[in-house]
Amino acid sequence: MSYVYFRLPHSTHVFRNRLSTEPEEIASLAELNGRRGFVIAPFTTSDDCPILLLPTDWEEVNLNFSGDNQNGEQTHLSSNDGVSAMLLDADYEKERQRYAVDFHNYHGQLTNDAFQKIVLARSARLTATEKLSPLTLFARACHRYPRMFVALFSTERSGTWLIATPETLISGTDGAMQTMALAGTMRLSGANLDFDVEGGSIGKDDIHWSTKNIKEQRYVETYITECVEQFSDDVNVEGPFTVRAGDLVHLRSDIRFHLKDTAHLGNLINALHPTPAVCGMPKDATRDFIINNESGERNYYSGFSGLLDPNGDTRLFVTLRCMQIEGEGEATAYRLYAGGGLLKDSQCQAEWEETEAKMNTMRQLFKHI
């Protein structure tokens, strides 16, 4: 049975939809104009990774609910089952070698001025010493990451994915919309672990952003603002400021605007996605390069998901911190994804460490709370 669970940022309400049929497949983002539903979109649409549109037949569930459903299937939605697991990565050295080759290839394009910025992604396929159900991992993500959009979905076409992401693609109600330019990454440590306010002052004086991070975020902000201005005459940019996502912080600008015509919401989404935060600049050239040169397939990583309603509430989020859950029982594996924006002055070791830090968002879920 296909299903989706989700919880919005800064909310305690969890909703689910268990589908009796497979979701509708959409050929292009522009075809989302005038449509309503829960959208699951890949980095780039293909026969293997279509855009999926699910109906909005939601029921609210208790995060601590545990039991059997009416079909006798076990339904477990508790974050406190007392189980911790060690994650094993048998291919770690091979992954590092592949990443180094990709980095050299990507960085060469930057030094030759082919691109201003490009995002290099990788994945790691892990096994665990204990098996944790997708619902347990979802519940733990809700508990650990209250600021993030958390979703768990499973369909025949997409497979099973768990997402905990800090980045909004677009949100709003009745045409009053907001998006964000999120880029730049630093790991919190020491006293900075107390940093707990979006745009606030706790630890602010101790968080110093490098020129590379500031430049990367500015690229993203400029691109997204220019996209939005095609669909709105009223655009307001606030930021950048520092926000927390797990044990990481990012630079973020908020971009608020009024959509001229809500019937063209799909066109706006098509213009925004993929943003420079997951792709690069210029958009089309870097996307084509990624598709043809990246060692692994991104699939639904760096796509987006969430609620779509042109005449109501829209809440779409970029699929950043995520894992794909493959197989069942003893054969279960967890494929974690992460990426980072490369500029001319990027260094391979630092970028590898950034992807490791981002993957820790998912790794932490295997530890008992």
Show which residues each predicted segment covers.
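Short, surface-exposed recognition loops or helix-turn segments adjacent to catalytic cores
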Residues: V119-A124, S154, P240-T242
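Contiguous alpha-helical scaffold segments within structured protein domains
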Residues: V61-Q97, D102-H104, L126-T127, M180, ...
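Conserved hydrophobic core element of enzyme catalytic domains
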Residues: I255-I369
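Charged, compositionally biased non-catalytic regions
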Residues: H107-S123
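Conserved hydrophobic/aromatic pocket- or pore-lining residues that grip, position, or stack substrates
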Residues: D113, I170, T222
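Cofactor- and metal-binding active-site motifs of prokaryotic enzymes
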Residues: M1-Y99, S133-L137, A151-L169, G175, ...
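An anion-binding catalytic pocket shared by soluble metabolic enzymes
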Residues: S2-S11, T127-K215, Y219, G312-G339
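A short glycine-rich, hydrophobically flanked beta-strand micro-motif that places a catalytic Asp/Glu
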Residues: I40, I118, V150-S154, R298-G306
